Amino acid sequence: MQITVSGLPGSGTTTLSRLLSDYYELELISSGEIFRRMAKERGMSLADFGAMAEKDPSIDLDIDKNQKSIIHTQDDLVLESRLAGHMAKGVPNVLKIWIKAPLLTRVKRIQRREKTISFDEELAKTVEREKSEALRYKNYYGIDITDLSIYDIVIDSEKWNQYQTLDILRVAIDALVGPE
């Protein structure tokens, strides 16, 4: 089974990917964590690292090339990244999930995770980061990140907690592939 999980920052993709990975005993590969680690290794904020990635396409292209290779060659995995669903284009039987949540909810989650000082500061950084990413995806791949038509499931993580969202996804997944 191959599952991709995508969504904007703070939507809950990493949490839900971990839960899906644990439940179905699938390997988890998270590009978001790779990107955060790369920013931290350089002593940069995500916004600053994103701005650097705008000027240096090799950062995104390397991450995305790696994702594409993984989804095309490896079974039994959850691939979590903003573009995971797009990277799975042409691969049969991949379940593509998009997790969404309103901007203010996502910013509150990011603020808790990143331990930032000011909500307004985090809001500005998140908006800037999303603009930066959308621009890069459009320029590099012609992808409109707001077009959710490629996804099999789109679910709002604000309406349910992570375990309820997992339960909803499990029902959908089990209906497609049968219970594990």
Curated annotation (Swiss-Prot):
Which residues take part in binding ATP?
7-15
User: Under the cellular component aspect of Gene Ontology, which terms does the record hold?
Assistant: cytoplasm
Q: Name one GO molecular function term.
A: dCMP kinase activity
Q: Which GO terms describe its biological process?
A: pyrimidine nucleotide metabolic process
Enzyme Commission code(s) on record: 2.7.4.25
Write out the entry's keywords from A to Z.
Answer: ATP-binding, Cytoplasm, Kinase, Nucleotide-binding, Transferase
The subcellular location is: Cytoplasm
Q: What class of enzyme is it?
A: transferase
Q: Which CDD domains match?
A: CMPK
Q: Which domain of life is it from?
A: Archaea
Catalytic activity, reaction form? CMP + ATP = CDP + ADP; dCMP + ATP = dCDP + ADP
Family, according to the entry, reads as follows: Belongs to the cytidylate kinase family. Type 2 subfamily.
Which HAMAP family does UniProt cross-reference here? Cytidyl_kinase_type2
Looking up NCBIfam families in the UniProt record yields:
cyt_kin_arch (TIGR02173)
> What name appears for this protein in its UniProt entry?
Cytidylate kinase
> Could you tell me which species this protein originates from?
Methanosarcina acetivorans (strain ATCC 35395 / DSM 2834 / JCM 12185 / C2A)
